Each structure stands twice: as structure tokens, then as C-alpha cells.
């Protein structure tokens, strides 16, 4: 059954005059509060992404171990092979490459003989053996903690360091900066933070400062590299 809308009742028109409405003043306008504009972020890209694998894996393998001086972090500071550089150094990054170390995770001399390297975490460099098969063989041999650990090698020009200052052009040398897993975390942090800065318009820096800091974890002390704009 359809419902019909009731019609409004008709009232007898009254002779009284309608009330006069008194206009009220418009409320005062409250000024709008605008927030300061934040710097716009463009397309984000990790800093130094274009430097990954500039030096090809086959070239890295052909160079072999120890071809260039190796910069590492020690409790006393940065080391270049056996030479002390001090707490800081300035470098120009040419390339950075992933390197996986397949290790028994044991400190005895015999275990050190079984350490292998892979650049893709699939095959052992120099032999072509499967990384997973090699780890399984190490565990079968009694090294229960055998595993693959990710490292990074940075190939760079060393242009200055704390103990000597700025190097003359003829003194600048190419070095292999070896990042431990702890230093690698700091490198990734730098890539993220600097990538944001560059997406906001900051110029890409040519040089980077490497600083060695002393760290402690689970009673173990070690040196760690940190990265900043030179």
C-alpha cells in the first residue's frame, strides 16, 4: 500500500504583522594559521646507488686479494694494511661491491683455512661450488655455526687522513675499504639519510669522511666505520 505524504495544514491568516528581524553583526573572522612549507621530497633514491658494481665482479675477482691497500676499522682507529691512519679519513668512492664470506665461525687456525668468498651468495669464487653445499659440508665436519656473512668492499681514492692531512695529487692512492657487517649498517644509514637530502636538492658530494668509533656488544669490543659528508 503506497504511503502518501500528509499535506501541511492550512491555517487562517492572522492579521498581526510579522516580527521584524534585527540584523546581527557578522562574527569577526579568525585569521587562518598557515604552517610553514616543508621541503619537498622528490623521487627518492639511495645515495651512491649509481656507484654499485661500477667495478665489475669479474674485474674484482681478477684483482685478487690484497692487490690494493686495505682500509679496515680497528680499536685504535683506521688502518691501511699495517699503517695507522688515525680516527678519520676522506675518500672519493669509485665503486662499491657486495662480498659474501662463507665461514666456519670458529677462531682456530684450522677453521680459518676453510673461509671462502662469494660475490653472488650462490657460488664460491674460484671453484664454482654451491655456497649452500659448502656450508652443509662445513656443518657436517663439525662447524655447526658455519654461515654466509655479507660484507661490502668500497673501492675509493684516499685523499686525506688524520695523521697526514690532505694528500698531494701524486700521493692519492686507490684503496679497498672493507666494511664489516657492523660498518655496513652505518654505510646503509648514510645512503638513506644522504639520499633524502639529495632528493630535496642537495648537491651530490664528491668526498665522504670515514670515522672510526669504538663499539662494544655482548662483551666484545670492535672498531666500526661511520660515514658523513666531508
Identify the meaning behind each predicted range.
Residues 184, 215-217:
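Short Gly/Pro-enriched loop/turn and capping motifs at secondary-structure junctions
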Residues 154-194:
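Short acidic, glycine/tyrosine-flanked loop/strand segments centered on an H-E-D-like triad
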